[in-house]
Each structure stands twice: as structure tokens, then as C-alpha cells.
Amino acid sequence: LTFEDGRKLTCTEDHPVLTSDNTWVKVKDLELNATKIKTSITCPLVDVNEEIKECSDWKLQVGNILLQTNTHEEYMKTLAFARIIGLLITDGHMNVKDKIASLFLGHMIDVYSILEDIKMFCESQQTNFVIKNLFIVRIPAKLTNQIIQLPGLLSGRKVNQTGMLPEFILDEKCPRPIIREFLGGMFGGDGHTCVLGMHRGKRDLLSSVSFSQTKTYEHRESLQSMFEDIQKLLAKCGIHSTTIQKPKETSFSKNKYQLQDKNDASNRSFQLTLHLPMEQLIPFSEKIGFRYCCHKSQRLEAGVSYRRLREEVCRQHNWLVNRVDEITHFKEIKSKNPDKTVPTKSAIIKAVEELKKTEGLLHDYAIPSTHDITDHLIKGTEFGKFTSKSFPTAEQFMEKIGALNWFLSDDNQPKKIDHMNEEVLEKTEEKEENELSAGYGVHRGSNALPTMNLEVVSRINVGPKHVYDISVEETHSFLANGIVAHNCMVSHGAARFTRERLYDVSDKFQVHVCSKCGMVAAYNDALGIHCCKMCDNRTDFAYVEIPYSCKLLFQELQTMNVVPRIMTE
């Protein structure tokens, strides 16, 4: 299946998909260019084992915590730590003297995500997270006491201190996956997602991703240096051509010091912004993304959808032009005889039919005219300005797929509070200036993510394929069994969600497995006694986490002389 934004889905013909009217329809019964399918955030798929190899035994000592990347569990724990630190230095507050650290979030979904990561290190006893327009997660003291020992973190108010990044992330040996998670946390905090801007009375300007921070006048140079370091980190993750905007005084600072001498900038705050070009929007979504901010992720998905449509239409247009040239030898004939007329109408029709048989035509705007063919093949002009009224603007596209409210809705619900410390107040005011005035992508009272509705423009038989989505190497998402299911990058939360549903809430259980024969061993952790009754092994065991039902199933099978074994590396 090819959807109207260019994304593709490979499935069996009797695979059920959820339509925009909340009914399940088999793929073979879909009405092309009419039926709309529900879809949501589609995250890239990564090979965890390959990334562990890429990290090549990297490790970091943080207080009493040793972060490593040798095993899957250690690797996931290290990624979680990088995400937490990325958010802490942007939308967080740390006080070394009081030994406290807090994280500021915009939605309860994000709170659950951060708690899952914190749980890898220690349990959190916090139950109330709401304060004014924010959700606050207080990092447990056990973890905070280790974090404050990390070099390069600022304690107290960050706005009037030198801008810097943690030392471990600036180390040339720091692996790309860890940098990716750190940047994801940073952009989840002080990053800015796609925005629909006004242009000539219409909301048709779609902005790209950016990142900003504020410092007082005397610390502007350090902030500039910090942003240059961020540019280098982005480049390591494959994001290039970023630009840093000149410092600009914040409106909050202007209002606060409006009666002060304008020549005295000592106490004024200036914001520095790093911009990603629109060409890097899709690469940013695929290679980094936002962590701990469902609102930004949701808008990014819609922005990527529109950007993908434009890029795919350009690609199809150029393919059609080149195919017409192959059929008619247009360029060759014109180079020999510029005045000769070369018929192209039938060739264009033939090329379009060929395209429809292979992948489907996304939009009629991709079909070239004879004038387009002349411009591209003879004059060398490029396609992609999208000035025609027949091609949808960003606002029209968002409205069509049901994502416009993600950019327009005003979902501010101030909460009544009795007291707030200075740091929380400062963060709240900063939030109100930068974020809360805009529409929120996910309704704050919702416990689920919204979906987009995309038309199916093409359905093509691709022959035998693996029926299990997990065996497909390409990026896919699909709808099944009444829920939205995805192949997601572990860092975007899918792996943690799967672990929660299949292990944490399913009577989680731990066993010690004999590394020699794979049988579950008898053990006493308190006394450190382990014994395999099958091979009398007493020294070589592996710790394995499985659902209790799985352990019970193994024991039932053993009573029937069927012996399941858990072989570990």
C-alpha cells in the first residue's frame, strides 16, 4: 500500500486496518483514493546488536554507577541515562547543595516515559506530578547523588552561569547512539518542533526543528560555544547544514527591564537559536527525534508527513521527465534541432501508467507538461517550488489528514498551587513564553496519542513476503487487533512499552539459568547459593527475567518429558 504522503506498508491482502470511521477493513477491500487509514508516529527501526558493537565496550563511571554497553540490559540502561541527562540540562533543575534534581515535562505520557527510565536505576515513590502548567518528576535521591558527581552539569539557576555540556558527551570516544539519545533528551526539553506560520494571511509556512537556550549578557559567548558543540554532535548523527541565529533579547527580559537603561545589558537575558534546514527535517526524525515530549513528536510526525509528500512528488516528477526522455529521445533531438517539435503527450501518459504499476502516483502535480520537460531537460531548471494552487499548502494538508488541531488548539489548563520555588517559577515563565502560547499536539487530559487519517493511493501486489512484520528490514508500521502497533526504535519507547505489557504487568519473575545445560537452577540469592540439579553445576549461571507464566509453562512441559532450555551468551 502507498499512502498519500508517500509512506508504504507491506502486508497480506486480508490484513485488517483501522479506517478513519473506526471500522476494520481488510486491505483487499480498501477503496483507493477514498478510504482513509488511521496512523500515528512511525519511528525508525535500528539493530540493537549492531549498535552495541558500535559502542565497542564504552563505559562511564558516574559516582557508584558504572555505565556500560556490553550487554543488552547495560546498553538500554546507558541510553536511558543519556536521555535523562539531556533533559536535565535543558528542562530540568539541579541543586548540588540540597542534592535535589527535578525534570519538567508537558504531559503525563512523558512522565510515564521518564519514570520507566528512572526505574532502571532505582524506584520512584513520587505520586503527585502536577504543578501549574507543568508536570514535575523529582529524580530519587539515590540517583541524584550519583548524577551530581557528573562533570559539566550546572547547579542552580542556569541562565546566569556559563553554558556547557557534560564532559562525557564531548569526549571524542563517546559513541553515536549515546549522543543520539542525549540530543533527543535535549531537544525534548529546549527544542522546538514544527510550527504552521502565517504568510500573506494564510497559515501555510511549515517551519523546521530548532533548539534554543537563554543566558544573561555576560554568558553569551559561552552559549555560542556550547551551540557550536551541539552542531558537532548533530553532525556525528548525520544532521548537517545547521545555522546559529544571532542572540536576541527575550520578551520576558524586555518586559522585566523596560525601565532600565537600554545601554545596560548586564541583567538582560538573550536567546540563542540553532536552526535545522527544512531538508534535514526527515533525517532529524529518523536519526534523533524528540524524547520525553509527545507533543513535539506528534507535530514532527505531521511535519515529516507533509515534507515527505513534497519530496516524493519531486522524485516522481523527475522520474517521469527522465522516462519521457527515454521514450521520445527529447533531449537528443532538441540538441540537434532546437526548433523541431517533439510530441510528448503519449509518452507522458505511458510513463504515468508505468509509475502507477510500480508504486502509484501520489499527486497529479507530479505529472510533467511539455513545458516542464523543456525546462528540465534543456534549460536545466529544478522542480520543487510548488507554486500551483492545485498542490495543497501545509495547512490544507494538515486539515485533510486531521492533524491541523495539533498546531492550533489551545490546551492550557493552569493548575492552582499554593507555593512555587524560584527555579520552578523561572521555568514556568520560560515555558509560557516559548511553548504554552502555542497549540499543544496532544490534549493534556488524554492518555493516548492522536492519529492522522491518510488515504491509500495505490495497492500493488508485490509477491510473497515474510508475514511477520518483525522480519521486514524496512521501516513499517501497521494496525492490528484494535491497537496501533509499530516497529519503533527502542529509544522512542516501544521496547519499554513491550517489556511493560509482556513482563512488568504479567507477574514478572526472575530465575538463574545454568550456563552449561540451560535449565532453571535452584538458588538462594541471600546466601549466594546456586545449584543445577541437572549437571551439578554450582558456579556458572545467568540471571534471566521472564514472566511467571513462562516459568510455569516450562515446568508443565518438563512433567511431560519435554525439556525447554534457556541458552544465554
Where do the language-model regions lie?
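Internal intein/HINT superfamily modules and their associated LAGLIDADG
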Residues: 1-487
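C-terminal interaction appendages of subunits in large macromolecular complexes
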Residues: 237-240, 248, 488-569
